[in-house]
């Protein structure tokens, strides 16, 4: 049976997924709760990793070691970093990387890779589902760091250096982990704010709306994969 893993950082990012999946088995391993459901002949596992890269990497590796998924989807909300991307649009990662670490340390030392590519089939599936739902979507780079970006000045610096479509706090870590484990991966994020001076206010207003939208997209992806 095919196994699909879904990882989100916050309970709000997984609440709708869990409600739509219904009651299933829950296993607690290494401090993480893994929700396990059978859906359309596939095993779908979801976990709330907690915020930031260390939590995301730990949860991803524990999930891989214990459940051996065929692919990993990182879901949730993110800040928009490209002027074309609006609140409630979807960004599908083409690649992920940290914005708060000199990539020299990743490229010139293990794992000898600083930019982690997303899987083509997963990207295509996410884009197809967005089209089915009539949701505006973009493929592009997602960057991650250890802070919620809500400053015009910080946003501009990240834009100039990395030219990303979205910023979050976990995608790069999940992608890094999947790269090391040779697993197909994609991050599918719904924009909750523009990562600017108004970011915190926008996040509070659109968090639940954005989380529900991306949850519906990710669950539809599991049906097509």
Question: Where are these predicted regions, by residue range?
Answer:
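Generic non-transmembrane alpha-helical segments
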Residues: 20, 121-134, 161, 177, ...
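A C-terminal functional module that forms or caps the active site or interfaces directly
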Residues: 148-195, 200
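Proline-aspartate-enriched helix->loop->beta-strand connector
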Residues: 68-73
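Mid-sequence, gly/pro-rich, charge-dense loop/helix-turn segments that line enzyme active sites
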Residues: 80-162
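N-terminal short beta-loop-beta anion/metal-coordinating cradle
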Residues: 1-67
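His/Asp/Glu-rich mid-to-C-terminal helical/loop segments that flank catalytic regions of hydrolases
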Residues: 195-225
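Alpha-helix C-terminal capping segments
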Residues: 62-66, 80, 84-85, 176-184
């Amino acid at each position: 049976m095919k196994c699909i893993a879904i990882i989100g950082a916050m309970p709000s990012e997984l609440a709708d997924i869990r409600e739509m999946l219904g009651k299933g088995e829950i296993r607690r391993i290494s401090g993480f709760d893994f929700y396990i459901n059978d859906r359309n002949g596939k095993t779908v596992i979801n976990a709330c990793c907690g915020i930031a890269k260390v939590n995301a990497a730990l949860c991803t590796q524990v999930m891989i070691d214990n459940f051996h998924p065929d692919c990993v989807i990182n879901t949730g909300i993110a800040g928009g970093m490209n002027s074309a991307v609006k609140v409630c649009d979807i960004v599908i990662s083409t690649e992920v990387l940290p914005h708060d670490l000199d990539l020299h340390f990743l490229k010139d030392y293990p794992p000898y890779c600083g930019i982690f590519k997303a899987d083509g089939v997963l990207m295509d599936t996410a884009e197809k589902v967005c089209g089915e739902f009539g949701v505006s979507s973009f493929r592009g780079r997602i960057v991650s760091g250890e802070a919620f970006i809500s400053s015009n000045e910080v946003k501009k610096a990240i834009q100039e250096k990395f030219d990303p479509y979205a910023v979050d706090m976990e995608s790069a870590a999940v992608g890094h982990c999947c790269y090391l484990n040779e697993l197909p991966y994609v991050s599918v994020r719904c924009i909750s704010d523009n990562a600017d001076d108004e970011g915190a206010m926008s996040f509070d207003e659109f968090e639940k709306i954005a989380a529900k939208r991306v949850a519906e997209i990710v669950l539809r992806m599991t049906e097509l994969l």
